[in-house]
């Protein structure tokens, strides 16, 4: 769609982190936003991400589904507590308060993508989702990370393809 400057890029089904990489590399904008395809976070929420980053509130705007009380059917109890655990662990490791490490909704400058990828390669960081790599890279390079609350709804598209695997080094 030329009016809205939207491109649709078909990936090869290799997972979220590769799909995000493909999307970022094919984008033309100054900023990049990530929104998971299940639409459990609504597209309309991206306006607040753009506003936050464009006025300089942060270098990485990270969606947080855990600031507001999630819709009862939106997140399994195991996932909720797992997200809480990872947020606390990564907050402790990074000395940066993060309330949700696995919310797929994020916004950053496109030029920062190369820095995130360099961090991943230099540290042999393997993250199947890409969220941890983005967060750790931003913290490592001293970026201002801002959690932005989002409403999290029951998915309206597809079924999860995520397996319960942990990232590793």
Which sequence ranges carry the predicted segments?
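Acidic donor-binding segment of Leloir-type glycosyltransferases
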Residues: 1-9
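Anion (oxyanion) recognition and catalysis
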Residues: 2, 54, 139
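Acceptor/aglycone-binding surface of glycosyltransferases and processive sugar-polymer synthases
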Residues: 11-26, 31, 43-124, 128, ...
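Acidic metal-phosphate-binding loop of nucleotide-sugar-dependent transferases
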Residues: 39-41
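Catalytic donor-sugar/metal-binding loop of nucleotide-sugar-dependent glycosyltransferases
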Residues: 123-124, 135-153
């Amino acid at each position: 769609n030329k009016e809205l400057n939207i491109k649709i890029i078909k990936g090869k089904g290799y997972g979220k982190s590769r799909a995000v990489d493909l999307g970022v590399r094919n984008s033309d904008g100054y900023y990049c936003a990530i929104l998971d395809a299940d639409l459990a976070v609504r597209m309309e929420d991206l306006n607040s991400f753009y506003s936050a980053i464009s006025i300089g509130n942060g270098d990485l705007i990270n969606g947080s589904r855990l600031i507001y009380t999630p819709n009862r059917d939106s997140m399994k109890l195991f996932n909720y507590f797992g997200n809480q655990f990872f947020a606390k662990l990564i907050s402790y490791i990074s000395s940066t308060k993060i309330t949700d490490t696995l919310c797929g909704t994020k916004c950053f400058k496109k030029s920062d993508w190369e820095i995130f990828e360099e961090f991943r390669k230099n540290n042999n960081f393997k993250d199947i989702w890409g969220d941890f790599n983005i967060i750790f890279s931003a913290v490592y390079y001293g970026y201002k990370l801002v959690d932005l609350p989002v409403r999290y709804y029951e998915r309206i598209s597809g079924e999860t393809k995520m397996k319960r695997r942990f990232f590793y080094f």
